[in-house]
A protein has these predicted regions:
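Short active-site oxyanion
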Residues: 1-2, 31-34, 63-65, 102-107
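Active-site neighborhoods of divalent-metal-dependent phosphate/nucleic-acid chemistry enzymes
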Residues: 66-117, 124
Length: 127
């Protein structure tokens, strides 16, 4: 089963038809399972509001299987920060991906350069 953890940057690019969104769509469609923290929904809806886009992102997020950690992610957060600095929301998404797949067999999809670098250093594949 091909699975990927999806960072908000990918769905924001698709929602706003940003440069590279066609590549992102193809990549998303190539996976059988798409995973993300429910933080993705908040980030996507906030971006839509900021840009005054009235469209409901429900269709974009309908393919996502939500991950709800049942414990603090202190260990995963420490692992990410020991690898390198990323901002808070980017850190959370990487930590949740480690929670879901500590063996790093899933892909980590992001358009954020720094987050991609750290995800690769952690051993995740990408787009």
């Amino acid at each position: 089963m091909r699975a990927a953890y999806v960072d908000s940057s990918c769905l924001v690019a698709v929602a706003f038809s940003e440069a590279g969104s066609t590549r992102v769509k193809r990549s998303l469609q190539s996976f059988e399972v798409l995973l993300s923290s429910n933080l993705l929904e908040a980030e996507l809806r906030a971006a839509a509001r900021r840009e005054s886009i009235a469209a409901d992102p429900a269709q974009l997020i309908s393919a996502i299987s939500w991950v709800y950690p049942d414990r603090p992610l202190t260990s995963e957060i420490t692992t990410v920060l020991d690898t390198g600095y990323v901002r808070g929301a980017d850190l959370w998404h990487l930590a949740v991906a480690l929670f879901v797949d500590p063996h790093r067999e899933i892909a980590f999809l992001t358009l954020n350069t720094r987050q991609r670098e750290i995800s690769q250093q952690l051993g995740f594949s990408g787009m």
